[in-house]
Amino acid sequence: MNSSNTGAPEAAQAATLEAFDRRAAEQYLRGQWIAEEHLMRAIGGPRPAGIPYRWEWKSVEVALDEATIALGPVDTARRHLTFVNPGLMDRGSATTHTISAGFQLVKPGEVCWSHRHTMSAVRFVTKGHPDAFTAVDGERLPMEDFDLLITPRFSWHDHHNSGDADVVWLDGLDIGLLQSLGAVFYEPYGDDSQNVRPSSSEGIGTRSHWLRPTWERGRESRLPIRYPWKEVNARLDVYDLDAGTPYDGLALRYANPVTGGPTMATMDCWVQRLAPGFDGKSHRRSSSAITYVISGSGTMVTEDETITFNRGDVISLPNWTNFRWTNDSEIEPVLLFSMHDIPALEAFGLLYEEPEAILNATPAPINPTPSLNPIYRPGAFYDQDEL
């Protein structure tokens, strides 16, 4: 059989289809056959959005100083440098495809005027001061070293530095996620400062404590919360040095103090401790993460490169990227703060991990005292989450 004759009908068919595709496009229609190649690429999982990348604190610190000179005095929340992932340059201010992070600096005496937006925000203070605070929906949240502050969606917030030294923090906002949902709203307050409650006893954040007023209905969401570092650090000391998993080391969630669930509906925050000499196992998740190095040094090893990190550095980890942590020191632990888009994926049933389920996969410690003379069935009268 003449192969050239066989190819002629196929070429004619291809030309017919190509002509149809052009006519359909003029009517803003597209055949599913055009998308088939994109579906085939998803076999085995998505392609990571962006690349693993590290921003060195020494370089960022210089850039912040230069920005201070270039901008001059400011009264807005704009002395902020966003970490733009080199693999996401077409998405604007994207550190991962869902979260944008960056450092913000407020000079002594400055007030960054009040505004609100539908993006939720976390603020991890890297250089605090006893006289600095953020006001969130009328509540004063102090900003001391390594404190974590929560600004829920559409909460009024303004930043104040009444101290005598610069204050710096790491911002994280779910901008990419909200942009993809078409849900970005913004509103300036119209004045530098919002009204602040006269007493902390009136605060919603105060009511997130485990001692709460009996005469009030409690709130579970949009809580303006501060997680003081001194309390977080004390909780780390409760756990044995080798506690945790061979993947993440000791990873503790900044839980919503009322529900016990994730930090926010769209973002979860962790503090991690990598024990001296930690050499973690490789794993990947369908979620993305941004990590700040509180102390120590080590590496994040991916399939393509080894990223070295030191104190103050920030690392972007794209979704579905194999990686593992190591701690260079045989003496000192590594401490990490990180933000994740895990809750958003969990809400849609789309959180996936390899090589095994890690998050929420291990039962909580069981009652260590079984009955010596059993009368009832083991586990009788227990709750399901105890079994």
Swiss-Prot record:
Residues making up the signal peptide according to the UniProt record: none
Reaction equation(s) it catalyzes: 1-hydroxy-2-naphthoate + O2 = (3Z)-4-(2-carboxyphenyl)-2-oxobut-3-enoate + H(+)
Keyword Cell cycle attributed: no
Annotated Cupin type-2 domain residues: 103-171, 271-337
A GO molecular function held by the record: iron ion binding
Keyword Kinase: no
pH dependence: Optimum pH is 7.5.
Entry EC no(s): 1.13.11.38
Pfam family, one: Cupin_2
Keyword list, A-Z: Dioxygenase, Iron, Oxidoreductase
Record InterPro entries: Cupin_2 (IPR013096), GDO-like (IPR047183), RmlC-like_jellyroll (IPR014710), RmlC_Cupin_sf (IPR011051)
Subunit structure, as described in the record: Homohexamer.
Organism: Nocardioides sp. (strain KP7)
Gene: phdI
GO biological process: phenanthrene catabolic process; protein homooligomerization
Function comment: Dioxygenase involved in phenanthrene catabolism by mediating cleavage of 1-hydroxy-2-naphthoate.
UniProt name for this protein: 1-hydroxy-2-naphthoate 1,2-dioxygenasee
Cofactor(s) of this protein: Fe(2+)
